[in-house]
Regions:
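Intrinsically disordered, compositionally biased charged tails
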Residues: 1-6, 224-282
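N-terminal cationic and glycine-rich segments that engage phosphates or anionic surfaces
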Residues: 1-68, 74-75, 79-122, 228-245
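Short hydrophobic alpha-helical runs that function as membrane-insertion/retention elements
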Residues: 68-70, 92-95, 163, 183-188, ...
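Short glycine/threonine-rich loop/turn motifs
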Residues: 172-231
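Extended, charged alpha-helical interaction scaffolds
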Residues: 128-185, 189
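Conserved phosphate-handling catalytic cores of large alpha/beta enzymes
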Residues: 101-144, 205-206, 214-229
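Residue-level signature of catalytic and energy-coupling elements of molecular machines
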Residues: 15, 71, 162, 214
Length: 282
């Protein structure tokens, strides 16, 4: 396992240490706050560094075990970064709006995904058999479903882990994940409630630079885990092939008994007759 390295200087440069105004804080975050400056809470980056490494380790384990991660953030600063992260690592994402029951009512969501895929397929056909008005209506329905479900269209079941940026905004996702005992990795700012978060990362959840840094670290972690899986799979295949190599067969040639031809038999009979005639003359 090779986790990406990050330093406190990198965290500082990305503004990870900058929390919210002191009057907006959540008292449950007090253990992660270093102090305040100009009425802004400063996050303890020593703890951030340690907890980031713990979270990355868990993400790596999840991927190596064959798990899938759902990335969730519907705030403007993170929508593009979250979708890019999921696409680059072959995971799933929600970056528009969290639909109630996305995890807890998966059967209904699955039906909506099927509807979305059906609309997409129908609209791709050159001859749909629909009127222009119907096609426009179908297009609007498809676009609406794509915004909400496009990032989970290939998700066959509930994810093995969920990553969240801004726990206040994504409180519904957290409630559903907790109900299903899905491990949660989340960025928790000074106004966040860390309750129920399995692997919290204290940090700024508003600055684009900070969000980009978190996502880049996670991306490198997942790619390394996937590389490990690929290497392990190749080694297993190679080992299996060696075990199944057939042993060299030793050919044993069995000579067939010689069969006398008719000519040979006639010759033998002739010689025998001559011997018999000579014997009778004596």
């Amino acid at each position: 396992m090779k986790l990406p390295s990050v330093t406190i200087k990198q965290l500082l440069d990305a503004g990870v240490h900058l929390g919210h105004k002191t009057f907006r804080w959540n008292p449950k975050m007090s253990q992660y706050i270093f102090g305040s400056k100009d009425s802004i809470h400063i996050i303890d980056l020593v703890q951030t560094l340690e907890m980031t490494n713990v979270a990355l380790h868990e993400i790596h384990k999840c991927i190596v075990a064959g798990g899938k991660i759902l990335f969730v953030s519907t705030k403007k600063q993170a929508t593009e970064t979250i979708s890019a992260l999921a696409k680059d690592t072959s995971q799933f994402y929600v970056n528009h709006r969290w639909l109630g029951g996305m995890l807890t009512n998966w059967k209904t969501i699955s039906n909506s995904i099927k509807r979305y895929k059906k609309l997409s397929e129908d609209l791709k056909k050159e001859s749909t058999g629909f009127t222009k008005k119907e096609i426009l209506k179908m297009g609007r329905q498809r676009d609406k479903l794509e915004r909400s479900l496009g990032g989970i269209a290939d998700m066959k079941k509930t994810p093995n882990m969920i990553f969240i940026i801004d726990t206040n905004v994504e409180d519904l996702a957290i409630k559903e994940a907790l109900k299903l005992n899905i491990p949660i990795v989340a960025i928790i700012d000074t106004n966040s409630d860390p309750t129920g978060i399995n692997f919290p990362i204290p940090g700024n959840d508003d600055a684009r630079r900070a969000i980009n840094l978190y996502c880049e670290l996670i991306k490198q972690t997942i790619l390394d885990a996937q590389k490990n899986i690929s290497t392990k799979y190749s080694e297993e295949i190679e080992s299996k092939e060696k075990k199944e190599e057939p042993k060299q067969k030793i050919k044993v040639e069995v000579s067939k008994p010689k069969i006398k031809s008719d000519a040979t038999e006639k010759k033998s009979t002739s010689i025998f007759s001559k011997i018999k005639t000579l014997a009778s003359k004596k």
